[in-house]
Regions:
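C-terminal accessory helical subdomains adjacent to catalytic cores in phosphodiester-
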Residues: 2-17, 24, 30-52, 57-196
Length: 196
């Protein structure tokens, strides 16, 4: 993910020690570092703090590990007004799921339509497909200028199954993108002008 620093925004990117982080382990880690007695970070709901779990569908969906994470986020959101009378319920805890993986979000920075299955099937993985489709690969210095395109393209291509889960080639990361865009809009305009 890319972030453009802002004076009025503090972003804490919390990594996980292992590759392919299990959503249930992410949830437990969040409980520990954000909610536990020995928490490392403090959430200020009065300031509109939010927490985002950006996850791939991978095998986690089949293993039933995403639904509990979503349930945990919902229950945390429901608790906010109970803990703080002056704070109305809002989506402080969020899941941004991509199907099949985060790279679909990168793909939509450049393309308006979902990829064709026949094109994707030529590659060993969707990540390889995206790497070959974006000439030179995704440039994290230059390509954030395409954030608004990515938001629009992803929003226009999102579809969900009967349970509200993103279907193939869909991503909820655009919702996080909309939140980021509120703070970086003018900087992205400057970057677009600089790049021509």
């Amino acid at each position: 993910m890319y972030i453009i620093p802002q004076d009025n925004v503090v972003i804490k990117y919390i990594t996980f020690e292992t590759k392919g982080a299990d959503p249930l382990k992410l949830m437990e880690r969040a409980k520990d570092i954000l909610l536990g007695e020995n928490r490392k970070y403090t959430i200020d709901y009065r300031q509109g703090d939010s927490i985002w779990f950006v996850i791939d569908t991978d095998t986690w969906e089949k293993e039933g590990k995403i639904v509990p994470l979503r349930g945990f986020c919902s229950s945390q959101n429901e608790e906010i007004p109970k803990q703080y009378d002056e704070v109305k319920m809002y989506s402080a805890w969020n899941v941004a799921q991509s199907n099949p993986c985060f790279e679909i979000w990168l793909y939509y920075h450049f393309y308006e339509n979902k990829p064709e299955d026949a094109d994707v099937e030529k590659y060993a993985s969707f990540k390889e497909f995206v790497a070959s489709t974006i000439s030179g690969g995704f440039d994290f210095q230059r390509d954030p200028a395409r954030l608004e395109d990515a938001i629009e393209n992803t929003r226009n291509n999102i579809s969900q199954d009967a349970d509200g889960k993103p279907t193939l080639y869909s991503s909820e990361v655009y919702v996080l993108g909309e939140e980021i865009d509120k703070f970086v809009k003018s900087d992205l305009a400057k970057l677009r002008n600089k790049l021509g």
